Every structure is written in C-alpha cells, then in structure tokens.
C-alpha cells in the first residue's frame, strides 16, 4: 500500500474514519495511479519466483519487510498487488485469503517515491474534505453565498482535480 493506514489515522483530518474505509480508498487510489501513469513502480532488483497457496507465498527475500507492497505476476490467476503482513523463514503471509495454488509466481517488490506518498496523502485529504461537494457549483443561504470550483471533464482526472495530480507527471510512462 502506498501509505500506511495507521499514518493516515494519526492525522487530524482522518479522525473518526474507519480503518477498513481508509484502506479501501487507498487501494483504489493506488490502482488508479498505476493505471493512469502506466507505471508499476517495481523494484526489479528484489524479484524471485515462488509457490502460492491460500494467503501465503512460499519463498522469501532478505529485502522484504512487513508492510511492504509486492506484485504477483505471471501466475495466470493471482496477478495483483498485495501487502505483506508476516514474514517467516518458510513463507510470506499476505493481506488476502484467496491466492490460488500456483507453482510459479513472479514476486516483485513495489516501491513508491516520497512525492507519490505525499501526493496520495493530499488526494486522501481532498477525498475527505471535498468529495461530498462535487457537483455543487454554489450555495446561498440568506446573505451568505459560497461558490465552489467548477469541476468538469476538462479539469478532472479519475474524479480528482487536475491540479492535485501534478505530482504524477514525472512518473508517466508512454503507452504503446
């Protein structure tokens, strides 16, 4: 996961939100960023093949830690990104219960640069503070009037204001 849920919960903007809700939003943002940039942020120096079953990868690397994100590929059925929850000498436990038994999975560590992490925190703040105001252009109550930034197809990407996504520009990869 790009940002640890506990990190967000410690911030005042996210007090009162459920861990599961934050986790789900973070996973959605992570997948959206990977698709939008066409960049999987893999550290190909930390890569190995291993068997999978249930919630375990039967293999390891000395360069992986609890909380790291890995990508499983070339399995046919388990492809995706997962977070490590436990590491033992025999296996790595992931944040899922539904890995199919496959003998050859390519496991690669995923690392996000610091500016991506900060950008995701800013996106999450926007999500919490402004998502419910999307679609409302202005409000008036008696003599008090509030006008919001107009969001249309020209200035939004993936449901977020284009100005908030500038941090992704250096990581865009060409699509062929």
At which residue positions do the language-model features occur?
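Short acidic, Pro/Gly- and aromatic-enriched capping/linker segments at domain boundaries
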Residues: 129-137
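Non-catalytic terminal accessory segments
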Residues: 147-149
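Short Cys/His-centered divalent metal-binding micro-motifs
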Residues: 124
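Glycine-rich and polybasic anion-binding loops at the starts of cofactor/ligand-binding domains
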Residues: 121
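Conserved short "hinge" loops at termini or chain/domain junctions
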Residues: 1-118, 131, 152-176
């Amino acid at each position: 996961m790009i940002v640890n849920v506990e990190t967000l919960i410690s911030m005042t903007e996210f007090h009162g939100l459920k861990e599961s809700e934050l986790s789900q939003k973070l996973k959605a943002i992570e997948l959206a960023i990977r698709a939008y940039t066409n960049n999987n942020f893999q550290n190909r120096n930390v890569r190995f093949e291993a068997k999978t079953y249930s919630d375990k990868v039967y293999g390891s690397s000395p360069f992986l830690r609890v909380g790291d994100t890995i990508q499983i590929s070339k399995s046919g059925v388990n492809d995706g990104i997962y977070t490590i929850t436990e590491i033992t000498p025999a296996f790595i436990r992931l944040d899922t219960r539904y890995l199919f038994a496959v003998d050859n999975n390519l496991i690669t560590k995923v690392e996000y640069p610091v500016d991506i992490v900060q950008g995701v925190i800013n996106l999450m703040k926007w999500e919490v503070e402004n998502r419910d105001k999307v679609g409302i252009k202005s409000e008036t109550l008696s003599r008090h009037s509030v006008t919001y930034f107009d969001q249309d197809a020209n200035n939004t990407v993936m449901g977020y204001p284009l100005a908030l996504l500038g941090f992704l520009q250096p990581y865009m990869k060409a699509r062929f």
